[in-house]
Amino acid sequence: QRVILISPMIGVTSFARFSGVAGWPSFLPAFAKAAWLTIMPEFNPFKFNSFPTNAARQSFLLTSALQTQIAADSRNKKLDQLPPIMTFQSAMDSTVSARAVITALYNRLPVNHSEVVLFDLNHAVRFNALLRRSSYTALSRLLPTPPRRYDTTIITNVTAGSTEMEIRTIPAGKTEQIVEKMGLRYLPDVYSL
């Protein structure tokens, strides 16, 4: 038995807390578009481009309640009853917080063979116009120093200049990583998985 999570909404940016304020003018007919944080053509079948302000506010309220519940369950040892969790998360996800997945969930889990799989940025191609300089070191700031109570797998470039990908795994309770070639390459126009 295992729980599989794909880019779980454990946390969102703190800006979402105030997104309801951005929608206030929408009560006036001339400002109806203010009910949306962004309005764009829906060209991406895997992600909504337009996003209503109320959805951002509700996402913040939901994740705040979820984090409170996880913390309480951790203190009361209820998380010990969970089966192992396996999470797939992009380090560059701009919709949900990768940091919250680690700090609010994984760092509270007991030792139970849980694993987080993180997809790193494609370091072989520089997307300077799209990304902040800090994006290239985001993953190193995301994880606590090993040993950890959960397995950590990172899918990244073999070297910063290579599009060849590898898997770097640090098992729970260990500090040494195991490196394995994937036999795959990042596409030149992909900055993250």
Regions flagged by a language model, labelled:
Residues K47-L193:
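Serine-hydrolase catalytic core
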Residues L37-P45:
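Flexible glycine/proline-enriched surface loops and loop-helix/loop-strand junctions
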Residues P8, V21-A22, P52, P84:
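Short, proline-centered helix/strand-breaking motifs
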Residues R17, V21-F27:
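Surface-exposed loop and adjacent secondary-structure segments within mature catalytic domains
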Residues S7, A35, T63-Q67:
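Short, well-ordered alpha-helical segments in soluble proteins
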Residues I4-R17, L121:
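Active-site nucleophile loop of the alpha/beta-hydrolase fold
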Residues P25-T38:
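A structural motif
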